[in-house]
């Protein structure tokens, strides 16, 4: 039976720093934002059973917490595996996905379904993606599940000039989501 004396309504919104501290998040040096890996499957998929391009065995799946603040963004990148983003709390996030076929789409990841937000978003393997907090937002807490599991060997950071040449109709968002280099 549930002990409702232990369940309290939220009295005030946490700050980003409180979330970082409570969830023991660390800066995501290569991408931006803050994260902590929370799960790495014990099951390992041999490289011989994986699609072309994987250099070694991979865990079946991995999961992280991921936090964005007004000072951070997720730099445009791609990974070799499918990613599934889950929205947990906070303000919505604007995500840009750039597909290998040249198409692009912007998705709002959040919990305001009436406004068209999506609480769960799939980023297919090989699709460039980056995201930022909506203007005026304080923070967004999400999760990201990757299968086959994430490995930095499968991570590629996007180069602004190459992305602008290929996806010129999204130049403003590409410029905002790529490091100044």
Residue ranges and their predicted role:
Residues 145:
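Histidine-centered acyl-transfer/condensation active-site motif
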Residues 1-11:
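N-terminal amphipathic/basic-hydrophobic helices that include classical n-h-c signal peptides
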Residues 10-121, 130-131, 136-138, 148-150, ...:
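Non-catalytic, conserved peripheral segments adjacent to functional cores
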């Amino acid at each position: 039976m549930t002990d409702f004396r232990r369940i309290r309504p939220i009295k005030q919104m946490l700050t980003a720093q409180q979330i970082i501290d409570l969830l023991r998040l660390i800066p995501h040096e290569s991408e931006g934002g803050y994260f902590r890996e929370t799960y790495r499957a014990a099951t390992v998929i041999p490289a011989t059973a994986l699609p072309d391009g994987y250099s070694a065995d991979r865990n079946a799946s991995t999961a992280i917490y991921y936090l964005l603040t007004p000072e951070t963004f997720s730099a445009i990148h791609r990974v070799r595996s499918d990613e599934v983003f889950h929205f947990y709390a906070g303000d919505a996030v604007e995500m840009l996905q750039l597909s290998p076929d040249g198409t692009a789409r912007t998705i709002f990841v959040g919990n305001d379904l009436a406004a068209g937000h999506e609480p769960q978003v799939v980023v297919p393997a090989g699709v460039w993606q980056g995201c930022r907090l909506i203007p005026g937002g304080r923070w967004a807490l999400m999760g990201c599940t990757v299968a086959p599991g994430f490995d930095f060997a499968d991570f590629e950071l996007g180069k602004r000039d190459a992305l602008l040449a290929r996806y010129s109709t999204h130049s403003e968002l590409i410029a905002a989501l790529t490091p100044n280099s």
